[in-house]
Protein backbone atom coordinates (compact mmCIF):
# COMPACT_ATOMS: atom_id res chain seq x y z
CA UNK A 1 0.00 0.00 0.00
CA UNK A 2 1.14 3.52 -0.62
CA UNK A 3 1.70 5.76 2.36
CA UNK A 4 0.92 9.44 2.63
CA UNK A 5 3.90 11.83 2.64
CA UNK A 6 3.78 12.40 6.42
CA UNK A 7 4.46 9.73 9.04
CA UNK A 8 1.33 10.46 11.04
CA UNK A 9 -1.98 12.28 11.12
CA UNK A 10 -2.68 14.12 14.38
CA UNK A 11 -6.37 14.55 15.22
CA UNK A 12 -7.53 16.83 18.04
CA UNK A 13 -11.20 16.66 19.03
CA UNK A 14 -13.13 19.10 21.25
CA UNK A 15 -16.71 18.97 22.53
CA UNK A 16 -18.88 20.20 25.39
CA UNK A 17 -20.36 16.73 26.00
CA UNK A 18 -17.87 13.93 26.66
CA UNK A 19 -20.29 11.18 25.55
CA UNK A 20 -20.57 12.63 22.04
CA UNK A 21 -16.80 13.08 22.00
CA UNK A 22 -16.22 9.42 22.91
CA UNK A 23 -18.61 8.29 20.15
CA UNK A 24 -16.70 10.38 17.59
CA UNK A 25 -13.38 8.95 18.80
CA UNK A 26 -14.74 5.40 18.50
CA UNK A 27 -15.86 6.06 14.90
CA UNK A 28 -12.43 7.43 13.95
CA UNK A 29 -10.64 4.49 15.59
CA UNK A 30 -12.85 1.94 13.79
CA UNK A 31 -12.38 3.68 10.44
CA UNK A 32 -8.60 3.88 10.79
CA UNK A 33 -8.25 0.25 11.92
CA UNK A 34 -10.45 -1.00 9.06
CA UNK A 35 -8.10 0.66 6.56
CA UNK A 36 -5.00 -0.91 8.11
CA UNK A 37 -3.48 2.04 9.98
CA UNK A 38 -2.23 1.83 13.55
CA UNK A 39 -3.44 4.29 16.19
CA UNK A 40 -1.83 5.95 19.20
CA UNK A 41 -4.46 7.19 21.63
CA UNK A 42 -7.03 8.51 22.24
CA UNK A 43 -5.28 10.58 24.90
CA UNK A 44 -7.60 12.62 27.14
CA UNK A 45 -6.31 16.18 27.44
CA UNK A 46 -7.13 18.45 30.40
CA UNK A 47 -10.68 19.79 30.47
CA UNK A 48 -11.03 23.57 30.18
CA UNK A 49 -13.54 24.95 32.67
CA UNK A 50 -14.89 28.48 32.14
CA UNK A 51 -16.83 29.78 35.15
CA UNK A 52 -19.23 32.73 35.04
CA UNK A 53 -20.62 34.45 38.15
CA UNK A 54 -23.86 36.40 37.75
CA UNK A 55 -26.01 38.40 40.21
CA UNK A 56 -29.33 36.66 40.80
CA UNK A 57 -31.29 39.90 41.06
CA UNK A 58 -30.87 43.01 38.99
CA UNK A 59 -30.52 45.90 41.47
CA UNK A 60 -30.27 44.66 45.05
CA UNK A 61 -28.82 41.77 47.02
CA UNK A 62 -25.21 41.74 45.84
CA UNK A 63 -24.48 38.75 48.11
CA UNK A 64 -26.85 36.50 46.18
CA UNK A 65 -25.02 35.22 43.13
CA UNK A 66 -25.21 32.27 40.81
CA UNK A 67 -22.34 30.45 39.12
CA UNK A 68 -22.38 28.76 35.74
CA UNK A 69 -19.63 26.75 34.13
CA UNK A 70 -18.81 25.57 30.65
CA UNK A 71 -16.59 22.50 30.26
CA UNK A 72 -14.64 21.78 27.08
CA UNK A 73 -13.47 18.16 26.84
CA UNK A 74 -10.57 17.32 24.52
CA UNK A 75 -8.99 14.18 23.05
CA UNK A 76 -5.80 13.73 21.04
CA UNK A 77 -4.98 10.81 18.77
CA UNK A 78 -2.32 9.98 16.20
CA UNK A 79 -2.82 7.75 13.18
CA UNK A 80 0.57 6.24 12.44
CA UNK A 81 1.61 5.27 8.91
CA UNK A 82 -1.66 6.24 7.21
CA UNK A 83 -2.42 5.02 3.72
CA UNK A 84 -4.27 6.94 1.03
CA UNK A 85 -7.28 4.75 1.76
CA UNK A 86 -7.18 5.91 5.40
CA UNK A 87 -7.14 9.58 4.39
CA UNK A 88 -10.07 9.06 2.00
CA UNK A 89 -12.10 7.19 4.63
CA UNK A 90 -11.48 9.91 7.23
CA UNK A 91 -12.57 12.57 4.74
CA UNK A 92 -15.88 10.79 4.12
CA UNK A 93 -16.53 10.14 7.82
CA UNK A 94 -19.64 11.79 9.28
CA UNK A 95 -19.12 12.77 12.93
CA UNK A 96 -21.82 13.81 15.43
CA UNK A 97 -22.80 17.48 15.63
CA UNK A 98 -21.07 19.40 18.39
CA UNK A 99 -17.61 17.90 17.86
CA UNK A 100 -14.83 20.23 16.68
CA UNK A 101 -12.10 18.42 14.73
CA UNK A 102 -8.57 19.66 13.96
CA UNK A 103 -6.48 17.51 11.62
CA UNK A 104 -2.76 18.05 11.03
CA UNK A 105 -0.95 16.07 8.36
Swiss-Prot record:
What GO cellular component is one of the record's annotations?
ribosome
Q: Which family does it belong to?
A: Belongs to the universal ribosomal protein uS10 family.
- Please explain the role this protein plays, according to its UniProt record: Involved in the binding of tRNA to the ribosomes.
Q: Which domain of life is it from?
A: Bacteria
Q: Which UniProt keywords apply?
A: Ribonucleoprotein, Ribosomal protein
What is its quaternary makeup? Part of the 30S ribosomal subunit.
Tell me what this protein is called.
Small ribosomal subunit protein uS10
Amino acid sequence: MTTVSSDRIRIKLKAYDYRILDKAVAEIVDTARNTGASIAGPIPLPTNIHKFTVNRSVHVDKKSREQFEMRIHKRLMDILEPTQQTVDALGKLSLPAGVDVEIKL
